[in-house]
Amino acid sequence: MKLNDIKRLYKIVRVFLSYGIDEILPHNKYTRSIRCWRMLFFWLKNKHKNKAFGLCLRLALQELGPVWIKLGQMLSTRRDLFPAEIADELALLQDNVEAFSGKIARQQIEQALGSSLENWFTDFDENALASASIAQVHTAKLKLGEEQEKEVVIKVLRPNIQPQIEADLSWMYKLAGLLPKLFREGYRLRAVEVIQEYEKTLRDELDLRVEMANAIKLRENFLDSPMLYIPKMYEAFCHKNVIVMERIYGIPVSDVETLQRNGTDMKLLAERGVQVFFTQVFRDSFFHADMHPGNIFVNPHYPENPQYIGIDCGIVGKLNESDKRYLAESFVAFFNRDYRRVAQMHVDAGWTPQDTNIDDFEQAFREVCEPIFAKPLSEISFAQVLLNLFNVAREFNMQVQPQLVLLQKTLLYIEGLGRQLYPQLDLWDTAKPFLQNWLNEQIGMKVTFKKLKAKLPYLQEHLPDFPETLMDALKQQKFISQQLVEINKKLAKQQRWQKKMFVLIVGIVIFSVTLWQFAALPLAISAGLFLVGFLVWLIGFLLP
């Protein structure tokens, strides 16, 4: 262990102890070592005894720095793991950190481009436009030739961030591995899986080319759409630690007052947020999974026909056809209060084990979800529905589905945003036609022919081999059948032998007990028992 690792460990321990994070753990033999840490560092007192645990956890993560802040932000969306009061506190974590020097940013850009910044850009502002834990952005103008320029923003990765991330991830894995041993509920949290999911997201953010590729795909999916605009990426200037994109001007989606002053159709804007989300999920199978208010703006030029502008495409979610179908059918079944169908969908999708008891599963869904319908449909939260479904499924050993976790997080953002813009938004009324139409399209002849067409190249390649493959399969089947016959013969022989041995042993036991008690028993009874024992033994001996 290096000196820097020891220093980092001490800081983590110091922060956790000073905020009393250890005090939530139960007193048992597994937590004895943690209590020893508390005694060893006797000078690190809990300075926040009167504060709620959620607040202390948020403040501790805030003090530990960017990597822990981002972990807390991710955990705030995992309401299937944490009580609402803790998740709400973690949602308040801010990713704003002090910007690094503009001169260092310039050096990073020039190193990536392989030439002086002035060869490609003018008006480069060394003061960062915005700064976050992983990267910061600067404004400039890109030279397009013939005295033309285009306003752009340049996103630059923080220098030397990799070693800190590696060190923090290492300690996160160690802590996650300890949790199941420290308290009973630790197994339910599946902490190691959570850190694995977080690591994947974090590593994607460390390669800005991933964000570039995501933005290009989203832009293509919504090209010329009145609902969503994604800024253009300038691929020739994009590298692992630097990307260049079109600069946009818009009204922050959270600035409701400015949107209203601009004459924005708030009802249509809220409905379009829902439509954009479901279009990404069910049409494209590819959705922006970081749609919090800081990443969404509204085009100010079309208030009567409002258009969203999305930035920061570093985190995206992907769903396969199976996930989409099961998810859509589960939603429709839920709102039809068909809980057996919901339960069956989870099993058929492979989200829960195949041996799950459907009757128990259905009843669990009914008990948790039925109270939701005490509210009008317009007030039911889609995100809460999804959360309830996941919570029940986890009790039946549902494995963590990262794509569904991202979906639930994004839906939470979209729903909250929609109701902030237009409190009367009926999410189900907006989404149901979309889901129903999509499901109807999946069972039509057009889709069937489309799927067959997609399989044609595979069929053309493998059809000539089909007779040979079929013969091999038949031979294999014959061989397997012969093997099964042999196995059955051996099993039958073994069962006969076991039966024979049992009868022989019973006969010997009767004979032995009679011999042992011969003096204590009347002669007639002893003779009778000898005869019975001999006959039982003889039957066993004569058995095949």
From Swiss-Prot:
It is found in: Cell inner membrane. Its EC number is 2.7.-.-. The active site is at D290 (proton acceptor). Its main location: membrane. Residues 123-504 form the Protein kinase domain. GO terms for molecular function: ATP binding; protein kinase activity. The chain crosses the membrane at residues 501-521, 523-543. Pathway: Cofactor biosynthesis; ubiquinone biosynthesis [regulation]. One of its GO terms (cellular component) is plasma membrane. GO terms for biological process: regulation of ubiquinone biosynthetic process; ubiquinone biosynthetic process. It is a multi-pass membrane protein. It holds the Pfam family ABC1. CDD domains: UbiB (cd13972). Keywords: ATP-binding, Cell inner membrane, Cell membrane, Kinase, Membrane, Nucleotide-binding, Transferase, Transmembrane, Transmembrane helix, Ubiquinone biosynthesis. It is an enzyme of class 2 (transferase). ATP binds at L129, A130, S131, A132, S133, I134, A135, Q136, V137, K155. HAMAP family: UbiB. Is probably a protein kinase regulator of UbiI activity which is involved in aerobic coenzyme Q (ubiquinone) biosynthesis. Belongs to the ABC1 family. UbiB subfamily. This is Probable protein kinase UbiB. It comes from Histophilus somni (strain 129Pt) (Haemophilus somnus). The gene is ubiB.
